[in-house]
Amino acid sequence: THGESVSPSFFEQLQQTTQASGPLAAAQMVADRMRAAGRYPELFEALKMQHRIELGLPAVHTTNLSTGVPDPISDDIQDRLDKKLIEACREVGTALIKQGKLQEGWMYMRAVGDSRATSDAMRHVDITQDNLDTFLGLLVHEGVDVRWGTELSLSMRGTCNTITMLDS
């Protein structure tokens, strides 16, 4: 469940995995655990660590303590890391949206820049009066799928309210 804490035995397993198979296997173990638990923001952090390790970087971003300047990363490695982080954003954002956590999911999907994938994920969520404003905000004002948002507004709010929405 989302509120469950990580047990001490999990930390022991993590330590054993790190010693036996290395930090990448441990990072993958954390990602798998967070994915299975539906803890998507934590999954994103685990995927960041995993991808940094895959690219030969420290698990977390480091800064030179004496200068306060971030440790340099080559352009090639940075580009590869950025691509992996976009894929992590896609996975986490899609999962959150499908859970009905539209705003949380959009925070990740905005970085992906794939309106179609966002719209597709949103189609898995039941539209209610409680989430209609969020749907319309993302579909119309954020430009995820203006056509669907307009059709949705027309069917649920009528012509006058839709015109007002489109004018704002």
Language-model features, listed with the residues they occupy:
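Long, low-complexity, acidic Ser/Pro- and Gly-enriched intrinsically disordered regions
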Residues: 1-110, 116-168
